[in-house]
Swiss-Prot record:
Binding-site residues, UDP-N-acetyl-alpha-D-glucosamine: 9-12, 23, 73, 78-79, 100-102, 137, 151, 166, 224, 330, 348, 363, 374
InterPro entries listed in its UniProt record: Bifunctional_GlmU, GlmU-like, GlmU_C_LbH, Hexapep, MobA-like_NTP_Trfase, Nucleotide-diphossugar_trans, Trimer_LpxA-like_sf
Catalytic activity: alpha-D-glucosamine 1-phosphate + acetyl-CoA = N-acetyl-alpha-D-glucosamine 1-phosphate + CoA + H(+); N-acetyl-alpha-D-glucosamine 1-phosphate + UTP + H(+) = UDP-N-acetyl-alpha-D-glucosamine + diphosphate
Pathway field: Nucleotide-sugar biosynthesis; UDP-N-acetyl-alpha-D-glucosamine biosynthesis; N-acetyl-alpha-D-glucosamine 1-phosphate from alpha-D-glucosamine 6-phosphate (route II): step 2/2; Nucleotide-sugar biosynthesis; UDP-N-acetyl-alpha-D-glucosamine biosynthesis; UDP-N-acetyl-alpha-D-glucosamine from N-acetyl-alpha-D-glucosamine 1-phosphate: step 1/1; Bacterial outer membrane biogenesis; LPS lipid A biosynthesis
Sequence segments annotated as region (Linker): 227-247
Class in the EC hierarchy, top level: transferase
Binding annotation for acetyl-CoA: 377, 383-384, 402, 420, 437
Functional note: Catalyzes the last two sequential reactions in the de novo biosynthetic pathway for UDP-N-acetylglucosamine (UDP-GlcNAc). The C-terminal domain catalyzes the transfer of acetyl group from acetyl coenzyme A to glucosamine-1-phosphate (GlcN-1-P) to produce N-acetylglucosamine-1-phosphate (GlcNAc-1-P), which is converted into UDP-GlcNAc by the transfer of uridine 5-monophosphate (from uridine 5-triphosphate), a reaction catalyzed by the N-terminal domain.
Name this protein carries in UniProt: Bifunctional protein GlmU
Binding positions (Mg(2+)): 102, 224
PANTHER family recorded: BIFUNCTIONAL PROTEIN GLMU, NUCLEOTIDYL TRANSFERASE
Obligatory cofactor(s): Mg(2+)
GO biological process, one term: peptidoglycan biosynthetic process
């Protein structure tokens, strides 16, 4: 498709959102409403024009796309007026695709069909059949041909019984659009310039008005308040989950799975309830995620078990590793093959070598740990001196006893052993036992104090 201009109407304030942000910057699945629409026109349209109004500077800063032509609508005088603001930027020999910034679930395939229809007829609109059409403009037909669109407030009782409604989304040959916009007026209940009035102009002019009917009523659903926003979030998430399952992902309950980003996965992966995927996440084959896990911007390999209640962010986990339960893997961590990060372990900006175990109740920060290392319960890498972070290096085969503190910067040698309860402040040599303890004293005649 060539010479297609998208006009996205995004000037509304969205008062019912009760928010300091304009409506089009409300988020659905970690993307703005406007961002969702922009993703659908990408690759479909040659130029994108966004008509902005309320908090326009905020909208432009958030979207931050130099390829967009931003057009200001200084007065909110209706959809027809909004589209007219963009027309000086659009060539006559093009197709204008008109979209709305608060209708985020529209599909690229639907828009492609609509554009194709308009290329044939000159003007094509998107309609939908609704059980409850309240609030929408009714499509008036005669002998199956569209004759007019009548807004809810201007409709007769007979017209209000019509279930086919206008979505407001249309594709029009730009020369025709300019011609018809010059003919509409504000003689209606709202005193506004309705974009839909161009349909009556086209009919009067003998112009064929073609249409396609959306197969999915949710893709044309608009958002006016936080309740509707939450409803669309659930629709968006269940649609994603359904698509993932069709591609082979096993979800224990698709209603309790959320993906807010880009998710790719291998074969035979299983995800239990209350999982949240954020950012860009990759799973290999045969990876299992237990309930209540959050995974963000991470690459996770094959045959990995992520047990319940783990938080994993910006890290790489190699094949065969086990994580959790109740583990937190913080950014810039690399966990190598068959390593184990157990319950109540926090790892930050560290490399955990292959076959290394950090099984419970430990903090590992700014560390490089070799292979076949055992980190016992309660081990802390003391990486922060109050100003700077320092590194801990632990060689292959080392054994760190329970309740030990490794005060960085420090190096623990290969096959070194750190005795339980030690505070280590100096390098521990290879193949030696290092420990720091006060001598144990037992007081033979000591008695516990009694209550007075």
């Amino acid at each position: 498709m060539k010479n297609i201009h998208a006009i996205i109407l995004a000037a509304g304030k969205g008062s019912r959102m009760n928010s300091s942000k304009p409506k089009v910057l409300q988020t659905l699945s970690n993307n703005t409403l406007l961002g969702h629409i922009l993703s659908q026109v990408k690759g479909l349209c040659d130029k994108v024009h966004v008509v902005y109004g309320f908090e326009g500077n905020q909208v432009q800063r958030k979207i931050n796309d130099s390829n967009i032509n931003w057009v200001e609508q200084t007065e909110q005088l209706g959809t027809g007026h909004a589209v007219a603001q963009a027309m000086p930027h659009i060539e006559d020999n093009s197709i204008s695709l008109i979209l709305y910034g608060d209708v985020p679930l529209i599909k690229k395939s639907t828009l492609a069909d609509l554009i194709h229809k308009a290329q044939q007829s000159g003007l094509s609109l998107l309609s939908v059949i609704l059980d409850n059409p309240t609030g929408y403009g009714r499509i008036i037909r005669k002998d199956k041909q569209i004759q007019a669109i009548v807004e809810q407030k201007d409709a007769t009782n007979t017209q209000l019984n019509i279930n086919e409604v206008n979505t407001g989304i249309m594709a029009v040959h730009s020369q025709l659009l300019k011609q018809y916009l010059s003919k509409i007026n504000s003689s209606n209940a709202q005193g506004e310039l309705y974009l839909t009035d161009i349909i009556a102009c086209a009919i009067t002019d003998g112009q064929i008005v073609s249409s396609i009917i959306s197969k999915n009523k949710f893709e044309i659903a608009g958002v006016n308040d936080k309740v509707q926003l939450a409803e669309l979030e659930r629709i968006f998430q269940i649609n994603q989950a359904t698509q993932f399952m069709q591609q082979g992902l096993s979800l224990k309950d698709p209603n309790r799975f959320d993906c807010r980003g880009v998710f790719t996965f291998g074969k035979d992966c299983e995800i239990d309830i209350n999982a949240l995927i954020e950012g860009e996440v990759v799973l290999g084959d045969n990876t299992i995620i237990a309930p209540n896990c959050i995974i963000k911007n991470s690459k996770i390999g094959n045959c990995i078990s992520i047990l319940s209640n783990c938080v994993i962010e910006d890290c790489v986990i190699e094949d065969g590793a086990t994580i959790g339960p109740f583990a937190r893997i913080r950014p810039n961590t690399h966990i190598k093959t068959y390593a184990k990060i157990g319950n109540f372990v926090e790892v930050k900006k560290s490399i955990i070598g292959e076959n290394t175990n950090v099984s419970h109740l430990s903090y590992i920060g700014d560390a490089i740990i070799g292979k076949n290392v055992n980190i016992s319960a309660g081990v802390i890498t003391c990486n922060y001196d109050g100003i700077n972070k320092h590194q801990t290096i632990i060689g292959d085969g080392a054994f760190i006893g329970s309740d030990s503190q490794l005060v960085a910067p420090i190096k623990i040698g290969k096959n070194a052993t750190i005795g339980a309860g030690s505070t280590i402040t100096k390098a521990a040599p290879d193949n030696q036992l290092s420990l720091s303890r006060t001598k144990q004293i037992s007081l033979k005649n000591w008695q516990r104090p009694t209550k007075k």
